[in-house]
Curated annotation (Swiss-Prot):
NCBIfam families: PRK05248.1-2. It comes from Actinobacillus pleuropneumoniae serotype 5b (strain L20). This is UPF0231 protein APL_0968. Pfam families: UPF0231. It comes from the Bacteria. Belongs to the UPF0231 family.
Amino acid sequence: MEYQFTHSIHGVVAKCSMDHEAFAGWLNTEITENPKELINIFAEIEKCRAAYPNHYECVFEGKEYSLFLDCDEVMVKANNLDDTFDESQIEDGFQFYDQESIAFCGLEDFENFLKAYQKFSKTYH
């Protein structure tokens, strides 16, 4: 997972590689408004590790995105992705674009992403 952080007058902004765009959307939407939530997320990451090889999962439901953690994988998904969508209304040759709505990565990659965000935020905020 590749990512980049920048700083603007609005604070820290995350950008992620194409297959992981939803992680940037989640961080920019859910975490920048409530950075203390990272404490709870890191605690759940540790619970996932401690539970391994047994199954453990946790969900953080946000206003626009929800975060799903388990021992192996992290998924972030836009809450509106489950809204009913009539694909028959799409013109021929077009597809529904959802790359910014759902993404997956490993638990360790996700933890590294959050730690890099914290470090950048402390350095440039």
